Every structure is written in C-alpha cells, then in structure tokens.
A protein has these predicted regions:
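FAD-site-proximal beta/loop scaffold in flavoenzymes
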Residues: 2, 27-100, 107, 205
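A conserved short coil-to-beta-strand element within the FAD-binding core of flavoproteins
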Residues: 4-16
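Conserved beta-strand termini and adjacent loop/short-helix elements that scaffold enzyme active sites
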Residues: 5-7, 58, 143-145
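Short, surface-exposed charged micro-motifs
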Residues: 10, 52, 66, 164-166
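Short, hydrophobic/aromatic-rich segments at coil-to-beta transitions
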Residues: 16-19, 139-140
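Glycine-centered tight beta-turn/hairpin loop motif at sheet-sheet or coil-to-beta transitions
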Residues: 23-25
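Flexible, glycine-rich terminal cap/loop adjacent to redox cofactors
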Residues: 102, 113, 118-129, 134-232
Length: 232
C-alpha cells in the first residue's frame, strides 16, 4: 500500500522493528524503515554571514566555474554548491579548487561525473539523457546491448538489464551512457573516461575488451550506436 500526503512525526526503534508515528496520532508498526526523502545543503555552523556569504533559494552557496564564492579567497565544494550530491563529484571539485588556488586554473567536467544507484540490479548513468538531448535539439543515435546476450552475465546468472550508448548523430561523439544490471556502476567507469576525452562510439567500439567480461556489453552497445553491431 502506498500512502501519499502523510507526514511522519517520529520513528521509534523497538525490539522487533520500529514504530512510525504519523501526524494526527496514527501509529504504524514496521519491520524496517527506509529513509528516502532526499537531501538538502547543510551549511549550519559554517558562519557564512561572518564571511560575507549567503545561500541561494535552494540553500546552496553560489560559486563560479572555479568554485570561488563572491569572496575571492573563499571556495566552496560538494553538497553545499550546485550539482549532484555525490562524494566523487565533491572530490573532483576539491582538486579543481586547490589547483585554481595554486596555479590559477582548475576545471571539473560535470558531464563526465557518473552516478550509481546501488540496488540489485545496479543503475548507473553518465552524460546526457535522451530527454535532455531532445530538449536541446541535439541530434543523436542510440545503441543498446542486453545483459542476456553477454557470456559473462549468463555465467553469473545475472542476465537482467542492458547498457545504452547515446552518440551524436553527425559526429558520433558519445553524449551519454546509461545502464541497469550487475556491476554496471563499475562498467560505466570506462564510459566516464570516454566522455571525458570526447571519444566517439567508434572509438569505444573498436577498443579491445576482455572476454568474457561485463565490459563487453558496453563495447557492443557502442558498436550498435556506431551502427555496426556484431553480436546482436
């Protein structure tokens, strides 16, 4: 049963689960409680006002392309600035900020930042989505390859899922890669590298991949995007 428009006022751990108290006095008994309400920037205790800084309407600290705030010698990174709240995104921003402090340059390619949902099967993505490409009027082509056609996936008993490669319809440059399946978060690390170095679907499709491995699914999807599929 899915209930909407309900406000939880308290969750109390008990010996055999938890008691969930709702607004209005209703109480639910649960075996497990999953907290999935999203996150928000947390800047309490940073004394931003003392530094002459403030947050935007979403609680984030505004920064420029070099992660500098409006106070030039103060930088901000991670969950308190724009972009996805991902640890590896924050790490890249930290490196870029320090590079800018030391050398006067520093850059993060946000299109090459992968995101992974660690469910079973995993879900992962990097780069543009089809919806974003359509909204921007960018012509693209799609290549897909299923886990069910992978020898390694079949040997693992993990045949559910696929990987999809989006490439520019004219230049063949990879624009986005999305997938669902076993270890797809690991497989898409190569896709992030491809986006970072502006590789084409042909580049990724021609690169040798070990057999049998899950990485072959990405190779085959790239070949399909290049419009030269082999094993499907």
């Amino acid at each position: 049963t899915i209930r909407t428009g309900v406000r939880v006022t308290a969750v109390v751990p008990e010996a055999k689960g938890a008691r969930v108290e709702l607004e209005g006095g209703e109480v639910l008994e649960a075996d497990r409680v999953l907290v999935a309400v999203g996150r928000r920037p947390y800047t309490e205790g940073l004394s931003l006002e003392n530094a002459g800084l403030s947050t935007d309407e979403r609680g984030r600290i505004p920064v420029d392309e070099h992660l500098r705030t409006r106070v030039p010698h103060i930088y901000a990174i991670g969950d308190v600035v724009r972009g996805p709240m991902l640890a590896h995104k924050a790490s890249e921003e930290g490196i870029a900020a320090v590079e800018h402090m030391a050398r006067g340059f520093g850059h993060v390619d946000y299109q090459a930042i992968p995101s992974v949902v660690y469910t079973h099967p995993e879900i992962a993505a990097v780069g543009y989505t089809e919806e974003e490409l359509k909204a921007q009027g960018i012509p693209y082509k799609v290549g897909k390859f299923p886990y069910s056609a992978s020898g390694r996936a079949r040997a693992m008993g993990e045949t559910e899922g696929f990987i999809k490669v989006l490439a520019h319809a004219k230049t063949d440059r990879i624009l986005g890669v999305h997938g669902i399946g076993a270890r797809v978060g690991d497989v898409l690390a190569e896709a992030a590298l491809a986006l970072f170095f502006k590789a084409s679907a042909e580049d990724l499709g021609r690169a040798p991949h070990a057999h049998p491995s899950l990485s072959e699914i990405l190779k085959e999807a790239a070949l399909a995007a290049w419009e030269r599929p082999i094993h499907l």
